[in-house]
From Swiss-Prot:
Keywords for this protein: Developmental protein, DNA-binding, Homeobox, Nucleus, Transcription, Transcription regulation
SUPFAM superfamilies reported in the protein's UniProt record: Homeodomain-like (SSF46689)
Record's protein name: Homeobox protein Hox-C11a
Location of region: Disordered: 121-141, 174-255
Top-level taxon of the source organism: Eukaryota
Gene: hoxc11a
Keyword Nucleus belongs to the record: yes
Organism: Takifugu rubripes (Japanese pufferfish)
Role of this protein: Sequence-specific transcription factor which is part of a developmental regulatory system that provides cells with specific positional identities on the anterior-posterior axis.
GO molecular function per UniProt: DNA-binding transcription factor activity, RNA polymerase II-specific; RNA polymerase II cis-regulatory region sequence-specific DNA binding
UniProt keyword annotation of Transcription regulation present: yes
InterPro entries hit by this protein: DUF3528, HD, HD_metazoa, Homeobox_CS, Homeodomain-like_sf
Family label: Belongs to the Abd-B homeobox family.
DNA-binding positions: 250-309
Amino acid sequence: MFNSVNLGNFCSQTRKDRTSEFGDRTGCASNIYLPSCTYYVPEFSAVSSFLPQATSRQISYPYSTNLSQVQPVRDVSYGLDPASKWHRSNYASCYSGEDLVHRDCLPPSTMTEMLMKNESVYSHHHHHHTHPGSNHPSAGFYSGVGKNNVLPQGFDRFFETAYCSSTDNQSDICLQKGEGGKQESDSQQPQQPQQQRQQPSAALAGASEQEKDPGDEEEQTNSGSCSTSSPAATKEGNAGKSSHSSTPRTRKKRCPYSKFQIRELEREFFFNVYINKEKRLQLSRMLNLTDRQVKIWFQNRRMKEKKLSRDRLQYFSGNPLL
């Protein structure tokens, strides 16, 4: 310990000598390491700083001392201040603050998040030409990608087909729905006779769906395969269809059966495939259904059972091992 004290005094003396002899080379004194000197920490606190004070010699610099403060290299390399990065500074005049935030952040996990982030920025810059009454649910969602150069120019052709321009004709608007993005145009009326032509074949082939509403089931029974319908009823149904073909047909709302109703109807069908009137009235009262709904459900269920038995027969006949 006494060696450290003596050596500390020696170090302080040599330090004072060095500052007096080599005043113009003050920057080199702090880099000298003396192996024989024990660096005693309290001794260093009493020593004055090596930096040039007002009493020491003034050093003349070849450059002007009133330069602007340079940002440390450490901040630039680690990106502590992303708004003032040197490689981002040329974008400041072209993009808004929200654009810079999106570009400096990490890329989002999915393409949808990136497109949704750019939607609000794109709508401010490029959507001044759209009509106020046009229905554009996802125009900014798609067109914001190819136009503000988030993706390369080669991807523009994929986004041009996903939205409408709405500058030529306001009536031709793309309504992109979650199920398939169908286009609603003036071609609805030619499609109505085609749908009505498909209904008789659907009634013959697969009219055994359990959850049919009474209006659709009435059309199926009138179109064929029902012995209870009279010829006058079929003529009225055909006349009604011809009148419907001229006007757009509105589909009735479907009212599917509940699980309890289906379970009770299936139980009765298991015992009796053909139901009598008394049992039918009893079921309709118990299940809170009409007499006609119970009758049509049994008709559809018999058609379904017939189709299942036919498929089952084809399956077993096609496999000789079974």
